[in-house]
């Protein structure tokens, strides 16, 4: 990409704004080195990466990139054996922490179901060095000092230092508080000179304290003396400080060596977080300028919807729709110089540069942009004083360079093509230059104020005229781009509004040819038609938005109604269940008491009578409870859905008809007068197949004992066997068994006959039969219960 193109399209100003959103010097370096890519696959991935970061910003509002520094120089010093300072080690630990936090932040979002495949790949490269990070922070405090707990030896040395300092101060303070101190000392203080404790003694009393003179005042009247009584203590203190320094250096060197061991991993982590800082800076910048991800195509056309220039306040700029490459390959914007044509030109250029840099662009959703190998721009007045070139010559030098390099993979932007020379010759050159570039297959946007180029757009198939709308009432451009309408000067209308007499204006009109007047009138009518069409489009758009709003409101009300209904039904169901459960518990208690009384032969109540009473109680359960049970039982497996099937939309509780499948997981469903997209997970096929009968479970609900699926009577006396059969059938029916087996053996047949005679009379028995070959044959009776 030509440096001149980046400069005239103000690409570096965009980078300056992007820099404001980086969190570290690492990210800032990435921004400074940013240039547009020309590789299609790379650009698509860059856009997807920025979009993932933008998703994170939308969901979380921030990213934990604090504490990250450019520690690469520190790591290199550690690798060559130089001892790192406490501050440098703290920077390394802080960056390790920041890397670890960033990895955890993204991983947590992914664990919560947020899809971030590209960012996941980035953070997967971060290797946690938690042990080394903690070792550094345990040895070095926030202020950059090596703490006492860094080693037992250091703690002991510092205790010695504190003890020595305390003893020295105590002795010196006793001296300063003595009765003679006021006379012999300049001030009753203890101070330090040359790292040794001293007191300020008047010159004439220097011999009183003995010791060593370390300094004197500017006047020479005061000497800073280390009294003889503390010389040995000061010597001991200095020795301890030397030991302290040696131990601190040993600890720092130990930490440096451990950093050197992990140097490659640390540098790799730094590169990852540098990229993450850069990626999230792009996402934050997109949020700032209200930008979106464009669709990147490789088919050499662009469709920018409501495009804005990123460096102009979005509150004041007028967005424009700009299409290029499908129906036409060249746009020629004509009209007066004050109409904002250059802004439109720069908007196209900067949007392409941003998109190819992986930046989102200030356009509406669904905008498309293509990849250009080269972008050429001849914009602005760049006269070269050194080369003694005029405006025209300066432009022509640039145009010659463009014509040498432009091809079918190029975007060419011309501002005021052919300006700066004789209008007739300039217009002719402009037409010839445009023909040359268009014939090479390049995509071109050109601005001009030459009226001759208005006809150019009508004489070439791949060229279309455009203009920037001008409001003659306010005498100012609206900056609205009108595709298909050539510009006009509006000189007569402006002059009239400014007070020029009609006589002068009419005379001026007579100097213009009839054909020119016709063309101007035709353009005026085209502008009016364009305005009317745009107004009608806006009205239709407003009606559409209102319809969508009403549709959303109706959906919301339906959902609220269904939620409220379901809430009330659930509440009623719960209350009913609680009442029925209470009654069941009470009935269970009564049945147990009656059985106890029967065992004690105080009353005569049959178990099947108790069963019937319990069945009547269960029959009193609310319909809602039964319905809920049925729904749970009849949950059908997922059906193969087809267009025309009737389904139930679970969110609304409404029936609907499938129209068409719009994606892998969504269908278009007609629900009454509404048509909406519904996920398969939110619908239920109405014609659910019948469920196979559930197998009985071998436990009695609400009881504290187990009931077997078979009763073995072999070896029992007849009377005892009959009592067991009666009890067993009652328990099996309470357990809701559909079928049981009674083993009586073949023997003489008396027990078998007695069992079957009893079964004939029992009201809970539906049918009975001998067992099949695999069930025990004549030695077993299989009983079907009601």
Swiss-Prot record:
> What EC class is this?
hydrolase
Q: What domain of life does the native source organism fall in?
A: Bacteria
**Higher taxonomy:** Bacteria, Bacillati, Bacillota, Bacilli, Bacillales
**Region spans: Disordered:** 529-549
Subunit info?
Answer: Homodimer. Binds to stalled ribosomes, contacting rRNA.
**A GO molecular-function term, please?**
ATP binding
Which ranges does the record mark as transmembrane? none
For this chain, the family text in UniProt reads: Belongs to the DNA mismatch repair MutS family. MutS2 subfamily.
Q: Does the keyword Signal apply?
A: no
A Gene Ontology biological process annotation?
A: negative regulation of DNA recombination
For this entry, the protein name equals: Endonuclease MutS2
Q: Which residues bind ATP?
A: 335-342
Domain Smr intervals: 711-786
EC numbers = 3.1.-.-, 3.6.4.-
